[in-house]
Amino acid sequence: MQKYGGTSVADPDRIKAVADHIVATRQSGQDVVVVVSAMGKTTDDLERLAHEVSTVPSGREMDMLLTAGERISIALLCMAIIDRGEHAVSFTGSQAGILTDTAHRKAKILEVKADRLRESVAEGSIAVQRRFDARRACPSCPPPAPTSSRSPVCPRR
């Protein structure tokens, strides 16, 4: 398992360097599963944009928005790995079998059914998964009420 944060994949040159490291690990005979964050300050930029277009961004839509940055990263990293002669497959959390509760912005992992990841690695692929953690909330937004999936009022106005 290798984990790369936003700084590690902040630009094309860094993505290529990460791909080189991953490919070297795979070519040494090791199976590789990679977890990667959004590029650079993408998550911060997306949160800022959400608060510019909405006084009360819903938790569900924030989750949807913030996963977009990591989807970009996993796709670009897979492209760079494939360009280096290895097979790579990107996975979202749901594709990887991560099951959570319904609390947007603070979801708890209930179960992991990693069959698709295991199958991909067993077939010789490098599995690349996004890092987005639904529990990572905007620091200024209050958590949703435990019995409600509706978004609370955001204090950033």
List the predicted regions and their residue ranges.
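Nucleotide/pyrophosphate-binding catalytic subdomain
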Residues: M1-R157
